[in-house]
Every structure is written in C-alpha cells, then in structure tokens.
Amino acid sequence: MSSFWSRNISLSIFGESHGPAIGIVIDNLPPGEYIDVEKLRQFMARRAPKKDGTTTPRGEKDLPQIMSGLLNDRTTGVPLCAFIQNTDTRSKDYSNLARLPRPGHADYTGAMRYRGFNDVRGGGHFSGRLTAPLCFAGAVCGQILERRGIYTGAHIASVHGISDDAFSRTKVTKEDILEVRGKDFPVRNDAQGEKMKEDIRNASQGGESLGGIIECVTINMPAGVGSPIFEGLENTIAQ
C-alpha cells in the first residue's frame, strides 16, 4: 500500500490506529517559513473528537510532537516530521475482526492484500485515525499559503438530506472562510447545523451512521496552475 504522495512536496504517513503513535514526514518545504505552533494545534483541535454525540467516542487529543524540520518556529528545509500518540485504544473491541470483517471497511480487502498479517485493531493503517497527520500537513501548508494570500476553507454542505447554505459561486471572501473555521460544527447556517446534529445523534443511538457532503473553496489561487489532461483540478481529484 502506498502511503506516500509526492508532487512539489512529499508526504509519507506512518502508524496504525492502535499502535503507539501515528505521524507524517513532509519533505521539500521551503526553508525559513514561520509556523505558528499554537495556530497549528488549534487547527488540529478542530479534527479531534467532540463530546457532543456527533463524532467518534474515542477521546484522542491529537497533540502533534514535532521531531525535526522546525527550529525557532521556522522550517529548516529538512524533512518536517511529526508524530501523534495514540492514547485511547480499546483493542479488545476488535478481537473478532480477523474472522468477521465489517461491511464497508477495509478489514477484508486489507487481509487479502497483506495475507492476514495486517493490524486489524481499529482498522489499522486503513483507519480514519490516519487523517490526523494529514490535518497536520494541511495546517502547515495552509499557514504558508495564507501568507501568500491563498485561503482554503470548507463547510458541511449536507447531512442526510439536510443542507447548509452554499458558498457563493462568484464571490467568496476570506471572512466567509474564517467565519466557518471558527465554529465547533462547521456550517454557515447554525439552525441547519442543529438539525444535522440531531439526525446524527439519532442515528448513533440506533447504531447507525450518516453520510454527508463537504463543500470546499480556495480563493486567490493564481491562474494557470496545473497542466492539461492529467494535472487539471478534476483530473487530479479523479486520481
């Protein structure tokens, strides 16, 4: 399985859901870029589970520990490595997965790919827990891009047929992006957000989960980024 991605920068993700830690190595970051560590932790806290019944009950704090690549809050130019400890694991809850794979998960395909040697606890390397290091990378790159005037943001567009107010197709401001970013439940219309949360809690009480749609926007991107055929926006997403 490839957990490595490389273009202008490279990302290598490591760890498993119930191992000691998970983490990421980011290479080719420009040297001398200021990284506000407190803002980085605030960004990571947005991903961490909430105690409102709408997220996983797993209580991870998602506190990244930077091992290399940052000195005096500035990138040094060498690979930036960070790891995040796993502190709330209940591996016994997954003891039967080697014999009874869950539908909709990677338990079966992972066993086929790795001949049964893969770590099934919590989903192992296939777990949503591995999005935490990706959020770390996004937080780092986001600070670098915002210094150049490029802002990216997202909100929950819909959950179970309940829709939030969409971003404008012609004019989105930095303030629009930052307003949603500061919310515990990232919607533009708080009344619709309350309806979403109620549906999520009801589904959770019944042992179910709900699907949703995210709308993401980037502003102030320079024109002409990418290439035809394989490196346009839709082409890149399709890959």
Enumerate the predicted regions with their spans.
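Conserved phosphate/anionic-ligand binding catalytic regions in large, soluble enzymes, centered on
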Residues: 9-29, 129-141, 230-232, 238-239
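N-terminal, positively charged regions that mediate nucleic acid binding
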Residues: 1-58
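Short, conserved charged micro-motifs
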Residues: 32-37, 91-93, 226
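Acidic-glycine-rich active-site phosphate/pyrophosphate-binding loop
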Residues: 1, 102-117
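Glycine-rich, mobile lid/loop segments that gate access to catalytic sites or pores
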Residues: 113-230
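Glycine-rich, charged/polar anion/phosphate-binding loops
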Residues: 7-12, 64-69, 195-205, 224, ...
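Glycine-rich, N-terminal phosphate-binding loop and its surrounding beta-alpha-beta segment
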Residues: 44-103, 107-109
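Short beta-strand elements
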Residues: 10-15, 22-28, 80-82, 110, ...
